[in-house]
Amino acid sequence: RVAGYSDLRSVDAPPLGKPSRSLTLGIGMDMMRGYVWTLGGQAYPKADTIDLARNETVDIVFANRSMMHMAHPMHLHGNLFAIAGADGGIVLKDTVLVGPTVSMPVRLHAANPGRWLLHCHNDYHMMSGMMRELQIRA
């Protein structure tokens, strides 16, 4: 048996408030434009910035809609997000593996202001557009 996120526990994970909103970011590939990977239907650098207020709590759902049947390690710079375990506990991570055809919800408490990248850690996907800028206002 392979351990999953629901098997992990954080010793000192802070309680998270209710989210102010939910964002679904589909993971996909735009075959009409060639080898272009997308996040939320948009490819970097022409993708819209995701704008958050400092201390805003949002749910982000990474929805792997790629037809290529591959996993995507989604990574956020500068902040941590929470992944819920089966028992209701949470673990804080900066990267989550989103398997083929899986929707993976995470909860982000935007505590660290700045402009941060959210991207696939498969470098060739990131370099082909699977990246967004996340701005947390001070």
Feature locations, PLM:
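Histidine-centered divalent metal-coordination motifs
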Residues: 72-79, 119-125
